[in-house]
Amino acid sequence: ASVAGHHLQWALAQGGDLSKLVIDQDRDAQGSKRSKHWRQIYQPPYDERLHSTRFVTERTLAFIEAAHQRQAPFLAVCSFPDPHHPLTPPGKWFDAYRPEEMLLPASRHDDLKDAPAHLRLFKDIHPKDQRNWVSPCGYGNDALLAEAIAATYGMIGMIDEGVGEILARIESLGLSEDTIIVFTSDHGDMMGEHGLFLKGFMHYRGTLQVPLLIRVPGHAAGRTQALASTIDLGPTLMAACGIKAYDG
């Protein structure tokens, strides 16, 4: 996607080409690979080292290094924009996963006859009005859905690489036994389930369930099926740090 804000300033400082970084959805960029099915699946025209995932990774690494040098406690919120539409994994990540090898959800051709009324109504709206936003891959276009899933996996793969670098840096600085690590997300994605894509007003597991991994030094590993919410994270982490929880 088009680069802006602090990310843009950082990318320019790395030698990025402004004409490639700032283009509306990169639709006019020459030479970038793109899907013939949906305009929001394409390879950005700039080098992968200038991508937002690299920006967030490197800023997080620098922040942790600076805190370590000051011997100061730190809270680092490492928030990657991806995976998110437009589906634009850069460089090698665009071809990292083959669409023809993607497993498609069994419910992708759901006619939504048992779904809430607002979803049944939505399905009948003309594609040019709404469906292209929330369900471009639904209602029979398996080729597009496979491309979308492959591109999403590419974005996730790049994030996984960045998270690995951050964890390795924490380890190399000798901070792993004094640092609580949380991995989670703000929402999921339908990824073609029930013929829907992206997120929105669909209260299915695909959008509601997110990964939640918490590592607290000195605590044994375990799993739970108990209902939890990201709203619980603040009080939980404050308690783990011996800080009085806030009201509200």
Task: Show the residue positions of the predicted features.
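His/Cys-centered metal/cofactor-coordination and adjacent catalytic loops
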Residues: 1
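Active-site-proximal cap/lid insertion segments
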Residues: 4-58, 63-72, 77-178, 182-230, ...
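Catalytic core of tubulin tyrosine ligase-like
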Residues: 233
